[in-house]
């Protein structure tokens, strides 16, 4: 799946699991229809709603040089009742 980077595990995303909503970080250039298609194809579920927002990059400093990280996009995907995504593993750091 080129468009989906990884699942997000924050306090809010864990709370949303109870409402059958899953949170993913996705490629910034991906469209909503592409993400919906990939989720339905890969996980075998039916998507009824998608919300997205773009998170800004962070400012990083290395000595006198000031730079920033890239912004990224986060999607909150709501599934039809009766469908669920199998347990996702956390990304190890």
Swiss-Prot record:
| Keyword hit for Ribosomal protein | yes
PROSITE patterns according to UniProt: RIBOSOMAL_L23 (PS00050)
A GO cellular component term found in this entry reads: plastid
GO BP: any one term: translation
Q: Which Gene3D superfamilies match?
A: 3.30.70.330
Q: Which domain of life is it from?
A: Eukaryota
Gene Ontology molecular-function annotations: mRNA binding; rRNA binding; structural constituent of ribosome
Which InterPro entries does this UniProt record tie to the protein?
Nucleotide-bd_a/b_plait_sf (IPR012677), Ribosomal_uL23-like (IPR013025), Ribosomal_uL23/eL15/eS24_sf (IPR012678), Ribosomal_uL23_CS (IPR001014)
Keywords carried by this UniProt record: Chloroplast, Plastid, Ribonucleoprotein, Ribosomal protein, RNA-binding, rRNA-binding
Compartment(s): Plastid, Chloroplast
Which family is annotated?
Belongs to the universal ribosomal protein uL23 family.
Quote the function comment for this protein: Binds to 23S rRNA.
Q: How does it assemble?
A: Part of the 50S ribosomal subunit.
Q: What name appears for this protein in its UniProt entry?
A: Large ribosomal subunit protein uL23cz/uL23cy
UniProt organism field: Arabidopsis thaliana (Mouse-ear cress)
GN (gene name)? rpl23-A
């Amino acid at each position: 799946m080129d468009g989906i980077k990884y699942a997000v595990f924050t306090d809010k995303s864990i709370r949303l699991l109870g409402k059958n909503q899953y949170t993913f970080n996705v490629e910034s250039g991906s469209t909503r229809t592409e993400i919906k298609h990939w989720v339905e194809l890969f996980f075998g579920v039916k998507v009824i709603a998608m919300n997205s927002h773009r998170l800004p990059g962070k400012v990083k400093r290395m000595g006198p040089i000031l730079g920033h990280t890239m912004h990224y996009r986060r999607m909150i995907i709501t599934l039809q009742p009766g469908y669920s995504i199998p347990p996702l593993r956390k990304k190890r750091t």
